[in-house]
Amino acid sequence: TAETEMNCLRQCILDTKKNAYAHHIQRLMILGNFALIAGLDTAQVNEWFLIVYADAYEWVELPNVSGMILFADGGYLASKPYAAGGSYINKMSDYCKNCNYKVSKKQGKDACPFNYLYWDFLARNRNKLESNHRISMMYKIYERMGEDKKKAIAYDSKHFLKAIYD
């Protein structure tokens, strides 16, 4: 619907609605990244991508969405999940300039949701992902975080995601 305070998501969804198209990076690193780190349902995300894009063919879209975007195949197609925080989006686009959230903030109600959802995704999927050498450094960084920060990440993520479904 594009009814979100997150400028990057809003713009990508509006462009998709208008053109039935989005650049690969918009699909992978904004829409797909959000679906991945927010823990959205694989079947529903696959269906959405197939419905909204004029160039979506099942033989291409399903492996790309399930394997590359959502890492739902456990790493057969992609060697690591394409997950990132707000800093990546800020470096690769100009969406953050006009966003209601602050990409520089890591927690709290004004923080970019990509920032805390990224760490929450890693925490939720630790058993599956920690042994992946391509992201093991991120788990070392997570381990060095204080317990208060980890609790704030979990709290912000829980409340943000709850608001989506309410």
Predicted features and spans:
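C-terminal catalytic domain of photolyase/cryptochrome flavoproteins
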Residues: 1-166
